Amino acid sequence: FLGSLFSIGSKLLPGVFKLFSRKKQ
């Protein structure tokens, strides 16, 4: 369970990071 959650998190992280950097600008 934790492994699958980590893989999903690593996939979502880049998208969230891009969204956050876009909000700053």
Swiss-Prot record:
Role according to the record: Antimicrobial peptide with potent activity against a range of clinically relevant Gram-positive and Gram-negative aerobes and against the anaerobe Clostridioides difficile (P.aeruginosa (DSM 50071); MIC=12.5 ug/mL, E.coli (DSM 787); MIC=6.25 ug/mL, K.pneumoniae (ATCC BAA 1705); MIC=6.25 ug/mL, A.baumannii (DSM 30008); MIC=6.25 ug/mL, S.aureus (ATCC 43300); MIC=6.25 ug/mL, S.epidermidis (DSM 28319); MIC=6.25 ug/mL, E.faecalis (MF 06036); MIC=6.25 ug/mL, E.faecium (NCTC 12201); MIC=6.25 ug/mL, C.difficile (DSM 27147); MIC=3.13 ug/mL, C.difficile (ATCC BAA 1382); MIC=3.13 ug/mL).
Organism encoding this protein: Tityus trinitatis (Trinidad thick-tailed scorpion)
Keyword set includes Phosphoprotein: no
A GO term from the CC aspect: membrane
Main location per the UniProt record: secreted
Record family assignment: Belongs to the non-disulfide-bridged peptide (NDBP) superfamily. Medium-length antimicrobial peptide (group 3) family.
Residue numbers bearing the Glutamine amide modification: 25
Localisation per UniProt entry: Secreted; Target cell membrane
Tissues/organs with expression: Expressed by the venom gland.
Name listed for the protein in its UniProt record: Peptide TtAP-1
Transmembrane segments: none
